[in-house]
A protein has these predicted regions:
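Bacterial Sec-dependent N-terminal signal peptides
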Residues: 1-27, 204-208
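Short glycine/proline- and aromatic-enriched beta-strand/turn motifs that initiate or cap beta-hairpins
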Residues: 20-54, 207-209
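Short glycine/proline-enriched coil/turn segments at helix->beta-strand junctions
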Residues: 21-23, 64, 166-172
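Gram-negative (and chloroplast) outer-membrane scaffold detector with strong preference
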Residues: 22, 28-30, 58-134, 200-209
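Short, electropositive, low-hydrophobicity segments enriched in small/polar residues
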Residues: 29, 33, 54, 127, ...
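Extracellular/periplasm-exposed beta-strand and loop segments of Gram-negative cell-envelope proteins
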Residues: 34-47, 76-100, 127-161, 181-199
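Hydrophobic, lipid-facing positions within transmembrane beta-strands of outer-membrane proteins
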Residues: 51-55, 101-105, 118, 158-164, ...
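A hydrophobic membrane-anchoring alpha-helix module
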Residues: 167, 172-182, 187
């Protein structure tokens, strides 16, 4: 996992000199984080509040078009049921909080309105989970990512990220939604539903222009 993060970071650095103007920045914000599953035909989202800290770059491509990669440290998680659709099995309600490295690579377009810049962006996001805790059956246990035990989650996720950003001078406000596309369960029994991580993040940031 560390090798993958290292390769992704150096790939970002190699792209930057090959293009035009590059501006760096930082952001910090709160996240409404949820784990989504389908229970008895309806989608349930067990949510919690987390945070997101990131370094980012704005790589100008053409006119209002730019590439915006990020390297973020994220606290996320949520709650979900084990065995909700397995006949004769005991249902377990699980709450988890864990930390991840996320690497969104967004394509953005910016509209200039007087002194304000309004931008929209979208792109894929890689998620590498590091460590965390899960409360299940009145016990707090460590999450061992990549293991195949009942209380564990998968290490890797691939998400789709969309967002809106407003810049004024060197400061900006952004709201983004990230939807995971891969099942996070380490073990999925017959009849169990898939489990997906979703986040909505509100951030304040600063660009070093």
């Amino acid at each position: 996992m560390r090798k993958i993060i290292f390769i992704a970071f150096w790939a970002m650095l190699m792209i930057m000199p090959a293009v035009g103007q590059v501006t760096f920045g930082v952001r910090a914000g709160g996240a409404y984080s949820s784990l989504v599953q389908k229970v008895e035909g309806t989608y349930n989202a067990g949510a919690r509040f987390g945070f997101s800290l990131a370094g980012l770059a704005d790589i100008h491509l053409y006119k209002g078009l730019s590439l915006r990669p990020e390297l973020a440290f994220v606290n996320q998680g949520g709650s979900f049921y084990s065995n909700p659709q397995v006949e004769g099995a005991k249902n377990s309600f699980n709450k988890c909080s864990y930390y991840s490295i996320q690497v969104p690579v967004n394509l953005a377009y910016t509209f200039i309105i007087n002194d304000v810049q309004l931008g929209v962006y979208a792109g894929p996001a890689l998620d590498f989970s590091l460590f965390g805790k899960m409360k299940t059956e009145n016990q707090n246990v460590d999450i061992h990512f990549g293991h195949t035990k009942e209380a564990d989650l998968k290490t890797f996720d691939l998400g789709v990220n969309v967002g809106l950003r407003v810049d004024y001078s060197r400061y900006f406000f952004s709201v983004s939604a990230l939807c995971g596309t891969l099942d996070r369960r380490a073990i999925e029994r017959e009849g169990e539903s898939s489990l997906y991580q979703n986040n909505v993040t509100l951030s304040l940031g600063y660009m070093f222009r």
